[in-house]
Amino acid sequence: MSVAVCRLTLRLPENSSLKGKRMVVKSIQQRLHNRFNVSVAEVEHNDAWQLAGLEIAAAANSGAHASEVVANAVAYVASLRLDVEIIEEDTEVIA
């Protein structure tokens, strides 16, 4: 079994409060979980209202499949119209 983990740093330029950030982050987490069956957690920038650090994890029988699922999830985040910019992405596969 392999696990792919991706750490994303997001910028929310239109956001003006922690409450607004929480709404956007929760929406992204729920959409990713429902669509790709991945685990998503907010891991960084908890007190910054214009930055969010998310970690996305997927487990699969092969590293290639886990990596593909995570890559598709990241592409989906980039395609959402939530005024979110991906400013950093780091993916690693653990076999």
Model-derived segments and spans:
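Cys/His-coordinated zinc-finger cores
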Residues: L32
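Short, charge-patterned binding micro-sites
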Residues: V3, A41-S62, V93-A95
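C-terminal binding/interaction regions
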Residues: K21
